[in-house]
Amino acid sequence: MQDSSSSNYSSNRNFVMMLVILFLMEFARGMYILSYINFLPTVTSIAIAITSFAFSIHFIADAATNFVIGFLLKKFGSKLVLTSGFLLAFISLFLVIWFPASPFIIIFSAIMLGIAVSPIWVIMLSSVDERNRGKQMGYVYFSWLLGLLVGMVIMNLLIKFHPTRFAFLMALVVLIAWVLYYFVNINLTNYNTKPVKAQLKQIVDVTQRHLILFPGILLQGAAIAALVPILPKYATQVVKVSTVEYTVAIIIGGIGCAFSMLFLSKIIDNNSKGFMYGVIFSGFILYTILIFGLSTITNIYIVWAIGLFIGLMYGILLPAWNTFMAGHINPNEQEETWGVFNSVQGFGSMIGPLVGGLITQFTNNLNNTFYFSAMIFLALAVFYGYYFIKTNRRVKP
């Protein structure tokens, strides 16, 4: 009994420490990717094309690394892979201190940071306790979201004092996360050293066995990300509000999401699989209605209310969807499978802004992008609603 309690304490301690490390790495990413490089064209001579490329290449590096990181963790072990990741992130952001507006360093650092964060995410997802997956995934996504947003906001404020003087803080945050890592005990599932050919075959096998999940993984990210390029223009030209009021809408949505992730996500663990299916289906339907509603509304107070509901729904839909995915994963292939899933999700997040921007540009109508995003969620609701009904019929005697 004592051994069991000690094991649970150690497991919980490791989980909390990994949450802190994830928060710090996302904090550094928020500072650099969401704030620092976006402000560079306004305070230095660096071109917008350079910073835009750095932004895109960061997520390409992240997605590409996710595809193979699970296999690298199994082959070389978590210590070597994570230490290499922290080293790459620290060196790249340390170089920014000395070359704050160098195009090469800006792009190089964006790539290295994308690579470095990948193994932390895969280990984090693999270490979640299956008995409390909904609740713990709420904590994971809360740490991710909080890290990104707080890092971005703090860097935005610091840039107002001086555009580059506080760049050292990004490397410092990574260094703190690196030190904390040595106080964590990480256990991988089914550690092995398969040859490259066998690993490639396993990637194909993992992909083929989870094809039913790919539409949801890819298209959810694409549908949400498609709105990113048009939301500022929608706020200022359609709703006709200031950037401050637009920021308030984002904050309200973030608060709703945080509340849902921390307090509502745990209900996924305490209810049946049918309840989880209902949350996912309802989430897709509500997203369809709410996103479509944004295309017809010009009252900022209603927009704030919709933002709150979207945040609340996102905070419970994400853990529910994650629990649904986890039910399809072989326990001995968690790192490999989560890596492939994260990679597919990353590609969805990359193509979303591109498609959303092109739709708006060629149709010259912001509403068409809202329609596109809403239709994706409607298609997901129909697809997975049908799948859930079939699954429930199959398990009934």
UniProtKB/Swiss-Prot annotation:
<feature type="transmembrane region" description="Helical">
    <location>
        <begin position="138"/>
        <end position="159"/>
    </location>
</feature>
<dbReference type="Pfam" id="PF07690">
    <property type="entry name" value="MFS_1"/>
</dbReference>
<dbReference type="GO" id="GO:0015297">
    <property type="term" value="F:antiporter activity"/>
</dbReference>
<feature type="transmembrane region" description="Helical">
    <location>
        <begin position="80"/>
        <end position="99"/>
    </location>
</feature>
<keyword id="KW-0050">Antiport</keyword>
<feature type="transmembrane region" description="Helical">
    <location>
        <begin position="15"/>
        <end position="34"/>
    </location>
</feature>
<feature type="transmembrane region" description="Helical">
    <location>
        <begin position="300"/>
        <end position="320"/>
    </location>
</feature>
<keyword id="KW-0812">Transmembrane</keyword>
<feature type="transmembrane region" description="Helical">
    <location>
        <begin position="46"/>
        <end position="73"/>
    </location>
</feature>
<feature type="transmembrane region" description="Helical">
    <location>
        <begin position="105"/>
        <end position="126"/>
    </location>
</feature>
<dbReference type="GO" id="GO:0005886">
    <property type="term" value="C:plasma membrane"/>
</dbReference>
<dbReference type="GO" id="GO:0006869">
    <property type="term" value="P:lipid transport"/>
</dbReference>
<comment type="similarity">
    <text>Belongs to the major facilitator superfamily. LtaA family.</text>
</comment>
<feature type="transmembrane region" description="Helical">
    <location>
        <begin position="275"/>
        <end position="294"/>
    </location>
</feature>
<feature type="transmembrane region" description="Helical">
    <location>
        <begin position="340"/>
        <end position="363"/>
    </location>
</feature>
<protein>
    <recommendedName>
        <fullName>Proton-coupled antiporter flippase LtaA</fullName>
    </recommendedName>
</protein>
<feature type="transmembrane region" description="Helical">
    <location>
        <begin position="211"/>
        <end position="231"/>
    </location>
</feature>
<keyword id="KW-0843">Virulence</keyword>
<keyword id="KW-1133">Transmembrane helix</keyword>
<dbReference type="InterPro" id="IPR020846">
    <property type="entry name" value="MFS_dom"/>
</dbReference>
<feature type="transmembrane region" description="Helical">
    <location>
        <begin position="243"/>
        <end position="263"/>
    </location>
</feature>
<feature type="transmembrane region" description="Helical">
    <location>
        <begin position="369"/>
        <end position="389"/>
    </location>
</feature>
<keyword id="KW-0472">Membrane</keyword>
<dbReference type="InterPro" id="IPR036259">
    <property type="entry name" value="MFS_trans_sf"/>
</dbReference>
<feature type="transmembrane region" description="Helical">
    <location>
        <begin position="165"/>
        <end position="184"/>
    </location>
</feature>
<keyword id="KW-1003">Cell membrane</keyword>
<keyword id="KW-0445">Lipid transport</keyword>
<dbReference type="InterPro" id="IPR050495">
    <property type="entry name" value="ATG22/LtaA_families"/>
</dbReference>
<dbReference type="GO" id="GO:0070395">
    <property type="term" value="P:lipoteichoic acid biosynthetic process"/>
</dbReference>
<keyword id="KW-0813">Transport</keyword>
<comment type="pathway">
    <text>Cell wall biogenesis; lipoteichoic acid biosynthesis.</text>
</comment>
<dbReference type="InterPro" id="IPR011701">
    <property type="entry name" value="MFS"/>
</dbReference>
<comment type="function">
    <text>Proton-coupled antiporter flippase that catalyzes the translocation, from the inner to the outer leaflet of the cell membrane, of the lipid-linked disaccharide (anchor-LLD) that anchors lipoteichoic acids (LTA) to the cell membrane.</text>
</comment>
